């Protein structure tokens, strides 16, 4: 899978702004990220922040690639209408809603038939 658009940010708000501007018009993007407790020497966002911002805008994470220079790039793309939702991501969305971070696009992507009252 080819990396067509690579985003590299230090600040979660920069990714949020990009997704707010492009969530309805782009097919995908790749975001430089890291996993673990120690931040790398280059600009990158923690994996959880990348995933949360994707969910806030109706997108999902998929492929993770290591770039030739050692950086990790996480692919994000819009969710398909009838895609499978894990309990983890549904619960993340509910938490993001409680925190006031969900957008209208993110809410529209959540499968209401999979959310029950016990999760709220």
Model-derived features with residue positions:
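Charge-dense, helix-prone N-terminal extensions
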Residues: 1-120
